[in-house]
Amino acid sequence: MKLAVIGGDGIGPEVTDEALKVLRALRADIETTDLDLGARRYLRNGELLTDEDLALLREHDAILLGAIGAPGSVPPGVLERGLLLKLRFALDHHVNLRPSKLYEGVESPLKNPGEIDFVVVREGTEGAYTGNGGAIRVGTPHETANETSVNTRYGAERVIRYAFELAQSRRRHLTLVHKTNVLVHGGGLWQRTVDEVAREYPEVTVDYNHIDAATIYLVTDPSRFDVIVTDNLFGDILTDEAGAISGGIGLAASGNIDATGTNPSMFEPVHGSAPDIMGKGIADPTAAILSAAMMLRHLGDEANAVRIEEAVARDVAGRDPEAPISTTEVGDRIAAAVVA
């Protein structure tokens, strides 16, 4: 298994090291290539993501990312557009996959959360994030700006099909989230596509929520959800809310996936680079380790993905919430548990 590793910035390299520790406990065939991408490189030489970097990434089976960002050192949007979004579009990561699970021993901010175990399938290469827009008369009283949301049948359908396949392997329930009563063109395309694809999956029940209703249900009744499929912007909102109700983004993993397998998919913890705790050895690597499990599942190694997830569940359940986290100790415990 050839892995490209982007440790990135802040605590990124620390948590990625622990994810690799767990992977190597299970697999002896892992070959890694470290790539220097992120704020440190940008501040050093102004480079973000070159054609050579992309060519090297394409030689690998998957990409493991730590964290990107240097708040206060790099202007907002530079790393997001020049590195992260460029990676997503260049490698056609059209599926953003975000599981949300409340583990035993983890406190939710919800008073009575019930069972939280669902997945958000977010379209990753279209919608409002394509950069299709502009502004005129900037800085004047007549300034006008627009951001065009681009939705194609091709782009929506491939993500919707991925979501149906996922739902079929889980509890067989899919929820489309959009705003079809106002966004009648883009929303209509999504609704029609879901309705048509649903005929091929008669075992999967389907319902629909407006985005505003979905944000309410995530707080009042999260157990109603199994697989949520939605567009880029709404998915961005829902996935952060989903992380918050299930114990925080410190436990949240994600995948940026080319479902065709043409390009390597990328897996990462949701949390940021947290430069304030960099080098202190107190960053929680759990999300990075769960990202590694997602990667194994994507590559067809279901058995080892389950081993990691079960080891994480036991480890989280046994933690003292008042005790400080040790990055390497968490990695050591989970690496030992997956082979016990």
Curated annotation (Swiss-Prot):
Domain of life: Bacteria
Protein keywords: Amino-acid biosynthesis, Branched-chain amino acid biosynthesis, Cytoplasm, Leucine biosynthesis, Magnesium, Manganese, Metal-binding, NAD, Oxidoreductase
Residues annotated as binding substrate: R88, R98, R122, D212
Keyword Manganese among record annotations: yes
Pathway: Amino-acid biosynthesis; L-leucine biosynthesis; L-leucine from 3-methyl-2-oxobutanoate: step 3/4
Cofactor binding note of this UniProt entry: Binds 1 Mg(2+) or Mn(2+) ion per subunit.
Membrane-crossing residue ranges in chain numbering: none
Site (Important for catalysis): Y129, K179
Matching SUPFAM superfamilies: Isocitrate/Isopropylmalate dehydrogenase-like (SSF53659)
Protein residues bound to NAD(+): G272, S273, A274, P275, D276, I277, M278, G279, K280, G281, I282, A283, D284
Annotated GO MF terms: 3-isopropylmalate dehydrogenase activity; magnesium ion binding; NAD binding
KW Nucleus (keyword) present: no
Cofactor (UniProt): Mg(2+); Mn(2+)
Enzyme Commission code(s) on record: 1.1.1.85
Pfam families: Iso_dh
InterPro entries for this protein: ICDH/IPMDH, IsoCit/isopropylmalate_DH_CS, IsoPropMal-DH-like_dom, LeuB_actb
GO cellular component, one term: cytoplasm
Positions annotated to bind Mg(2+): D212, D236, D240
Cell compartment(s), UniProt: Cytoplasm
Catalytic activity: (2R,3S)-3-isopropylmalate + NAD(+) = 4-methyl-2-oxopentanoate + CO2 + NADH
Biological function: Catalyzes the oxidation of 3-carboxy-2-hydroxy-4-methylpentanoate (3-isopropylmalate) to 3-carboxy-4-methyl-2-oxopentanoate. The product decarboxylates to 4-methyl-2 oxopentanoate.
Assembly: Homodimer.
Family designation: Belongs to the isocitrate and isopropylmalate dehydrogenases family. LeuB type 2 subfamily.
Alphabetized HAMAP family for the sequence: LeuB_type2
Record's protein name: 3-isopropylmalate dehydrogenase
Organism: Corynebacterium efficiens (strain DSM 44549 / YS-314 / AJ 12310 / JCM 11189 / NBRC 100395)
Gene name of the encoded protein: leuB
